[in-house]
C-alpha cells in the first residue's frame, strides 16, 4: 500500500499540519482525509504544491508499506 508520509516531513522541518493546510487552501475535510491517508487519490496539483512548499520530491512524500 502506498501512503502519504507528509507528517514526517512536516516534523523534520518544524512545520505544522495547520501551516500546510493554510498553504494548500483546500477544505479542511479534504485536507484531513489526505493527511490521514483516508482518500483514494491525490491530485497532481496538490502533490506538486506540497513538494514545492516542503522542498522535496514526490519520492519523499510517499511510503510503501506491506499493509
Question: PLM features: residue spans?
Answer:
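Short alpha-helical DNA-recognition segment
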Residues: 16-33
Amino acid at each position: 500500500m502506498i501512503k502519504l508520509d507528509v507528517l514526517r516531513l512536516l516534523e523534520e522541518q518544524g512545520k505544522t499540519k495547520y501551516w500546510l493546510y493554510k498553504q494548500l487552501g483546500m477544505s479542511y475535510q479534504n485536507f484531513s482525509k489526505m493527511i490521514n491517508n483516508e482518500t483514494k487519490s491525490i491530485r497532481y496539483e496538490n502533490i506538486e504544491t506540497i513538494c514545492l512548499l516542503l522542498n522535496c520530491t514526490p519520492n519523499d512524500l510517499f511510503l510503501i508499506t506491506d499493509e
